Amino acid sequence: MKNSKVIKLQDRVPKLKNQQKKKKKNVNHRLILYISILFLLVLFLIYFRSPLSNIKKISVFGNHYMTDEQVMKESGVTYDTSYFRVTAHKAEENLTKRKEIKAVNVKKRFPNKIDVHIEEYLTIGYINKDGKLQPLLENGKTLDVLPNGKLPVAAPIFEPFKEEKMKELIAELEKLTPTILRSISEIRYSPTNANEDHLTLYMNEGYEVSTTIQNFAKRMETYPLILKTIEPGKKVLIDLEVGAYTKELGAEEKKNRMIVFNTLS
């Protein structure tokens, strides 16, 4: 009986040793795991605080009145900014303070890229002030005069006139389709004894339009259709004050051609 008990104890010794080895291996694995995590955290902290985490590329879209550099400065995001310190909504708030900006979307692209998508208020015209052009936006606000005289967006140019009439015209210009708005080169306020709201338009197609502020947008709806009725090369005045008709210019006998369009229906 004694011998059998001894044998049983001896059988258990290898099992105990195996268990101890397994425990030791588990401890080693955990230690390696903890050290690895700690090492990665240290690397991340070093990367976070070093210039390696700075923005490497900033792409700006939709800006006409601000340079890319100005957008970066206003947003607070530059190439000296750490990617992890960029807060998209804060950059958007900074940019929407600009009166020409309607909406902004800032996107972060890991590991070091930023995209800035800008939606500007529609430019409905340029006010000519002593030969310098001042952009007029659909929200009724004006921007600083353009430094180089170049038009960043196609829109009509007009001379300043009575503020009340300007407001009425702005409200009408906002209703125009982009195609018609881009067709207008210049708007002149030219009141007559019969019509204090009279306007003279000079179109990019080379034609002159006589119209009025009242229901201006509705009257101009027919302009693209009228163009199709004009023979190429003809100098024509398009009268949209009452109904719509064209008057040929430069001929010995000026010819009037009635066009069947009811502009106010």
Swiss-Prot record:
It is a single-pass type II membrane protein. Coiled coil: none annotated. PROSITE patterns: POTRA. Residues 53-121 form the POTRA domain. Cell division protein that may be involved in stabilizing or promoting the assembly of the division complex. Belongs to the FtsQ/DivIB family. DivIB subfamily. This is Cell division protein DivIB. It comes from Bacillus anthracis. The lineage of its organism: Bacteria, Bacillati, Bacillota, Bacilli, Bacillales. The gene is divIB.
